[in-house]
Every structure is written in C-alpha cells, then in structure tokens.
Swiss-Prot record:
Oligomer and partners: Binds calmodulin via its IQ domains. Interacts with APC2.
Annotated motif D-box 1, positions: 490-498
Alphabetically ordered keywords of this record: ANK repeat, Calmodulin-binding, Cytoplasm, Cytoskeleton, Developmental protein, Repeat, Wnt signaling pathway
Gene responsible for this protein: INVS
Entry's Gene Ontology BP terms: kidney development; protein localization to ciliary inversin compartment; Wnt signaling pathway
SMART domains listed in its UniProt record: ANK, IQ
Annotated stretches, region: Disordered: 589-615, 636-688, 746-782, 809-833
GO cellular component: cilium; cytoplasm; cytoskeleton
Protein name: Inversin
Amino acid sequence: MNISANCLFSGSSLASEVHAAAVNGDKSTLLKLIAGNSELKDKEDQFGRTPLMYCVLADRVDCAEALLKAGADVNRADRSRRTALHLAAQKGNYRFMKLLLARRGNWMQKDLEGMTPLHLTTRHKSPKCLALLLKHMAPGEVDTQDRNKQTALHWSAYYNNPEHVKLLIKHDSNIGIPDIEGKIPLHWAANNKDPSAIHTVKCILEAAPTESLLNWQDYEGRTPLHFAVADGNVAVVDVLTSYEGCNVTSYDNLFRTPLHWAALLGHAQIVHLLLERNKFGTIPSDSQGATPLHYAAQSNFAETVEVFLKHPSVKDDSDLEGRTSFMWAAGKGSDNVIRTMLDLKLDIDINMTDKYAGTALHAAALSGHVSTVKLLLERNAQVDALDVMKHTPLFRACEMGHKEVIQTLIKGGARVDLVDQDGHSPLHWAALGGNADVCQILIENKINPNVQDYAGRTPLQCAAYGGYINCMVVLLENNADPNIQDKEGRTALHWLCNNGYLDAIKLLLGFDAFPNHMENSEERYTPLDYALLGEHHEVIQFMLEHGALSIAAIQDIAAFKIQAVYKGYKVRKAFQERKNLLMKHEQLRKDAAAKKREEESKRKEASLQKGMQNMEQNKFQVQLSTAVREKTASTLQLSNKQTDLQNKRPLSVSASQIQLGRNSRGSPKACRSKGSPKESCLSSELQSEGHNIRQELLRKHIKSKPSCVHFHCGKVKEVTKVEAKHQVAAATELNGEKHKEHAVEANGTSAHGNRRHASACGTAGAGEKTRDQSLSSSGNRGHCEGTSVVVCNVSCAGGIARNSKRCEAVPKSKRHQQKSRHKEVNYERCSPAGSSRPGSAKVVFVNTRNATVCAIEHANNVGNHELAKKTSPLLSTETESTGTGPRNPAACSALDDSLNLEKTGEVGSRSAGDQLCSVAWQSTNIELIPLEIRMQIIEKERTRKELFRKKNYAATVIQRTWRSYRLRQELSQLLSAKRQRKEDEDKWRQETAAFLIQVAWKKQLNHSPQKSVPSCKSLKSVNKTSSAIKTSKQSILKQIYGRSQEGRVYQPARPPSKLKLSDVQLVSANNLQYVNLLENVGKSKQFSYNMRPSTAAKSKSTRLEH
C-alpha cells in the first residue's frame, strides 16, 4: 500500500502529500503538514475526499484520531455524497463506526443513490455494525428508503441475511413496504437460488403469515411463488405452498401461473409439486390460450412433458390459434418431446390442423428443423398439406430459405408446381426472400423461371423488388425473361428504378431488358419516370445513356406519328364520304330516270292504242275500195290470176327458204319476205276470209307487242333518248317526201315490174346487209358498254311500189355520209354526267318509219300469209319447221320500229296523220338536236369531267403523301441506328450514303403538277382499228372509280434527273435535313385538310447542296 501511495503522490502538490501521509499512516508527517497549514486537514482531492476518508479506507485509526483532534469535519461528503461513516459502514469497520458516531457522525446522511449507512451495513454477514447503528437511531428511522424505495429489510432479504431480518423486524421494521417495482421483502427472499433462503423466508413469514403476504403481487403481477419457481428453488416452493393461503394458480400480467414458469424452465419436480398442490384441479392457460404443457413441449423438456401427460388432470388442449402442444414442439424442433408424445399418446393425430389449416409439418418447415421434418415424414405426415393460403410446407421453407428442409421435402415427394391463392409459386417466395440457393434448387427441379402469379408478376420481379442481385443472376442465367410485364404494365426494371438499385439495373440491361416499357395506369410511367420520382440521379444518368425515355418524350413521338396517320385517315374518310354521296346521287338520278321512262312508256302506250284504232278504220276503207275494183274486173282476168298464183308459189317457198337460211347464218338485221303481193291474186271469198284472219292477228299483235329491239347490256341513257327523238323526226319528214315519189312510180308500173320483183328484192337485201354490217362495225368501234339498240329497217316502199330498186338500194355516197355522221356522233359523244365509268356512253341507232302505214302493211301480210298457208301446205310446213314465218319486210320493220321507240322512250309522240308515209332508212345527224339540249349535255359533261379530275388529283396527293411518309420513316430508322451503333460509324455512313443515292436517283425533286390532256382534242384522228384504248397503271382509287372518260390520262414525260452521282455528298445525320426527301414539296399543302389554301404559291423544289 505504501509503494502504491508513494507512486501515486510522488511529485504532487502539498495537498497530495497530506492525503499520502493519511493513507500511509505517517502520523508525524501528517501532523507537521497540518501544523504548517491548518486548512490541509479538510483538503479534498480530485474525488472530493478528505484525509479522514483516506484514513477510513486505509484503516489508519491513529491518523484518524489525530485529524479529529485537529478539528477535521466528520460529516464532510465527497463527490458521491458519501461521508466517512458511509465508508466505514460499507467496509463493516466496527471501530471506525464507533469512533465516528462518537464524534457525532450523521447516520441519516444519504448518498446520491439515497442510501444511508444503515442500508450499507446490511451487506455484511455480521450484524454488529447494524446493531450499533440501530442503537443510535430513533424507532421511525429504521424504514428509511433509498432511491428505489427499498428499506434495510429489503436489502437484508436480498442478501439472504436472516439475522439482519430478525434484528430489523425486532426494531419494528415494516415487512409490507413495497419498493419501486412493487416487491416486498418476501419477494426478494424467495428470489434466491440458495436453499438457505428458506430461513429468510421463514423469518418473514413467521412475523406475519397472512394470505395477502403470501400472494402479494408486484407491479407485473408476480407473487413470491413465481420468483421461487423461476429460480427453481424447490425448498422455497415447498415452504410457500405449504401454507393453505398460497394460490398455486395465480396469474401474472401475462396470465402465466407458477406452473407455466415451471414448465417453461423444465423444473419437473416443481411441476409435480404444483400439480399435486393444485386445489382447483384444472390447468389454466395464459393470454394466448397456451397451457403449461405447451411451454414444456416447445422447450424440449421431455421429462416435464411426461410428468404432465401422466397426470390425470392434464389434457392437450389447443391455444387460441388452434395449435396443440404437439405443434408447438414441432415448431421448436423438440424431437424428444415429439417422440415422447407419440409414444405416450397413441391416439394423437400427426396431421391435425390449427385455425389456419397448418399442420405440425408446416411449423417444422417454417422453423427450419430438418430433423423434425424427417421425423414427421417418417411418421407419415402429409407432405403437401394445404393451409388456408394454399401453402404447403415447401412454401414455408422457401419463404425462410431453409435449403436442407426444401431438399428433404422434395425427396419426400413435395410438388414444386403448386401455387397459392395469389398465384405465387415456391419460386416467388424464394425470390422475395432473396434466397439464390433455394431458387437454384427449385429450378433444377424443373420449375418454370417465368411463372406468373395472378397479378402477372414473375420471380424476377419479386427479386428486383428487394434488390436481391444474386437471386436475379440465378434467374437470368436460367432464361428468365426481363421484359415480362405484370397486369399493371410494370417490369422488373420499374421496381429497380423505383428503389434505386443501380447494380441490379446494370445487370438487367445487360440481359437485353427493354428500358421503355410503360405501365397500364393513367400516368403510363416508364422506368425512367420512376427513377425521376425517386430522385435517383445515378440511375437516371445511366438509363439515359442506354436509350431510356420518359412518358413525356414518348408522348411527343407518338403525337407526331398519330398526327401523320390521322391526316391520312381524314383524307380517306372525306374521299369515301364524297364517293358515297356521288353514288347516292347517281342512284337517285337513275331512279328518277326510270320513273320518268315508265311514265313516258305508259303515256305512249295509250297513244299507240288510240293510233291503232284510227289505223284500222283507214284500213277498212282501203279494203272496201279495193273490193269494188276487183268486182268490176272480168272473170277471165280472175282465172288468169289464179293460174299465175299457182305458178308463183314455188318462188315464194324458195324466197322464204332463202330468208330462213339468211336468218340461220346469224345476221337477223331485217325481217324480209320476197313473196309477191297477194291482194290482186285472190278472189273475193279469199279476200274476205283473209280480212277476218288479219283482223284477229292484228288484235293479238297489239296485245302481245312484239319487238325486234335487241338489248345487249346496261340501260339506255337520257342523252340517247334526246338523239333518238330528233332522228325520228328528221327521218319521218324525209320519208314523207320520198313516199310520194315512190307512190307515183308505183302507179305507173305494169306486170313487168312484178317480174323484176325477185331481183329488186335481192339487191335491196344485199344493200341492207352491207349497211347493217357497216353499222355493226361502227358500233363496235365505239366501245359502247351500255345498251345497243338494233332496229330492223327496210328500205322498200309500201304497197305495190316495194319492187323498185331505187327504194331499196341506197347510194354509196349517202351511206358513206351516214357512216361518217355516226362516227362523228360516236366519237364526240361523252358519257353522261355522274357516270361512274368514263367511256360508258351508249350509242343508239334509230330508223323510223310511218307507224300507221307499217301497221296496215303488217296486217295485210299476216292475212295473206294465213291464206298462203291454207293454199300451200308445203310452204306452211317448211315455215313452221324453221320456227319463223315469211313476213312483209316493210310492215315488220315499221311495226317493230314503232314498238321499239315506244318501249325505250326514244321516239317522240307523233299524230297518226303525220306518219302515213314510208321512206328509206336514214341516220340522224347531231345537228338535228336542238341547241338547248346540246348545251345541257355539254354542261353535264363538263361537270362530270371536273369531278373526275378532282378525284384523280386527290388520289395523286394521297399517294405522294404516303411515299413521303415512308421516306421519313426510313430516315428516322437511320437516325436511331446511329445512336444504337456508335462503334460502327463507318457502316452507318455507308447506309446513309446509299439511302441518299437512292432518293436522288429514284425521286424527282422538281415536280410539276400533272395535267391530263383532254381526249376530245387528241382523238380526232383516231381510226377504226386504233380505237381500242390501252390500259395504263392505275392507282387503287382509279380502279374503284374506273378509268378516265378519255380512256388514258396523258402524263408529261419525266425529265431526266439533274443530279449526278458525283454531286451526292456523304454527309452525316446532321446534314440530312438539307436533303429534300418529299415528292410533293409544297403541293400536299394545297389539299383541303392541310396548312395553307390551294391558291398559295407553289414552293420551289430544293436541290442538294454541297
């Protein structure tokens, strides 16, 4: 002690020398120092201690007495508020305590912890110091409490000093004072593992053996029995439970009884003791519904469990979650308890489920106890049992990452392809826990790495959510797809950018993850948007370097493309609406024309019937006059005529045969009969009989309305009707004049004219045949697609004058003039306005005759034919065999003409008196059409051409716009290729140069608008053989609306390109903006939907500049 003191205080100040002298017991030096300076007797060191305190600590009684004689302060306190008496009581130094108490030391002084010297004296086994203090203390001062509200009796019980307890109780210390935790001295006495604590407990209980003292609960509800059981002190438990007032099943604040504590700590003897002394006979449960057996089972105390199971009052009840003690044992891996319970309780159900349908195997797998799992599988536990979440034990093991348990379960037959109620597979749970080894095991057992749950999330997305990069590496190496989107449109990259896992983002982009997937929400966020919202600056920079786009940038790009597509859509829609409107108008016009034709036909039919009645009256008058002339003739002439009639019958037969043969050869252009007239050769009886037959046939003919008009295809147009009307009018006037001349010549003709009848008719037939052929060829050259009307015409005059060659043979010059007129009409004729196909005009050739005269001649010929059939059976037989009978050509032609004109509405109504003349056939000139009607036709044609020109122009603009859009798309692909292939700059330059050369070679920079040349000017010199129009390449719209009316749109020849290959500069992407890639620069804007009006000036074509 002296050596240490010398070392401590060597080289120190004078005060330190005083303290050193006190410690060393150097009384002479101490007195010398005090004599030199009286203040040194109470000098404090760095701890606030005086030389007197050091004398107590060093047990230097002589020095202490010297200091006290020198006037040292006995109650001086140090920094911890302790005096020399505190130090003497703490050391249990009886002499110093007696010395200090004699010098009036304060025994009630409290230190910083509120302890008095009385509290400190309880630490020692000897009660002498305690007894010395109790002699100086008043009766009420013995229960002084420290800062923890503990008295000297608390400390005596804590230190297990039964003598101190007895001494304090003798001095009236209160045994029921609780401390700051609510504990009384009996709690501290019972909370001791030493068996000798039984004496302290007995001392306290002997002082007051009350029930309230035995069952006193601290602030946590624990009784002295709880503490005794917790320390495993069987003797103290035995003492406490020996009192009848002790409650063995008292609850603490956790609803645990002393029996729960004994089971939890595995005190089998205490358990047995408590079970035996339980007066209620029931096993209480804690706040979770667990019995003491649950506690013993989870702690793997097989002996304690055996004690419980063997006691008759114990049952394996379930807790509040429906778990039995067997499940608790499985969850804690208590294999010994499980074996004990399976051996002792044969009726135990190993697959019993709890409230959530979990089994003991679920609990063991969740906790990762491999041995327990093996034990349960050996005892036939169900390996794929499902709980309410549809989780098997494998799910629980994958969630917690217990690799060995997973392997054990898979070997035991667990299925890896099951999913829970959310669609999560075991791989999902392994990825959520970041267990890379478990993921590898599951993938090796053939689980799909891209399996999706009901929300569309993959295991890769689950791993990305937690940023488990090791787990992501395993999944990606096993072909996990990083671009799969869940139902909300999010990918694994969305989760990584949201949480700012830069290393995982680098890994994912290295496996070709697309950086611009948009979610399906209203905001349509991309991974870059999530990084921006989270303010992860490093992630933002990295994503931008790898081509990531925000939703705002994507919307700008999409808006540009949508606008381009929408413009095209508007053009197509407007075009379709215009087309539908035109078609609707065309249909309405056709319906109106058809209705008008129907009304005209009905009106003309009524007028025809009225005309036929007038014609029949005139016919009777003519027959009456003829009968009077025949009666005045002599009987000799009658016999001669009969003889001549018999001689001419073979000629009639032959003529009919010739006519039939001509018809069979396929040229039925006119219905002819070469037989001579029958009126002058018959008797009065035959004439009367023929008159009756003709009357009947005429009525039938009027009812049946036969027609020789042949319809090929289509319908007759309104313009054709107008031409036909004027042709009929002109032809009627000319025929009227010629009819008078033929009538004069016919009256002067004798029997010699009758002998020339055959030759004249043959000549006329040949002339008409030639004329019909020319008309048919001229019709073919016109390319008429509508209705071609061929009218049976006869050039012979009516009555006996039909034999004249002048009436039948038409001069060649006149026929040539007629052909030229037809050609002129055909070529100058345009399709009607509103027609859907150009060149669809219908050409109609009309030949008219006097309807009244033709009808009379037809009735006479029919009657004569009936008489001929009776007189000549051979003729009738041959005629019936061929299916056609010889008819009077003039009558047939005139009647057919009149019926055709009435049916088609092409001949105007005329009075019966104006149509009594029959003349040779003549074509109608277009000059005969009134000027007003011609102007209407021309105006309609102009309107139709203008409409077609607009359609053609719209189609051209749409095609040009589409081609320019394709060029812009190729250019954008080249620009994006540059950003993606920075390392291959030369290859990109080559592709760019090739693209520019292609544009300069194939596309024309200086465009002029296409103008169609009118066909009316270009077709004046077209001949018959070259009238067919060659079809050109048409656009889709031209194919829909047909070719142009002229048949061909003449396009100006494309000038040779002014650009040369040497002029093309291999420029970078920044110079591409100076290249004019659009065909229709400045022209597409002239359309109705574009930016400027069509009257704006045309933009000049741009050239490539170096």
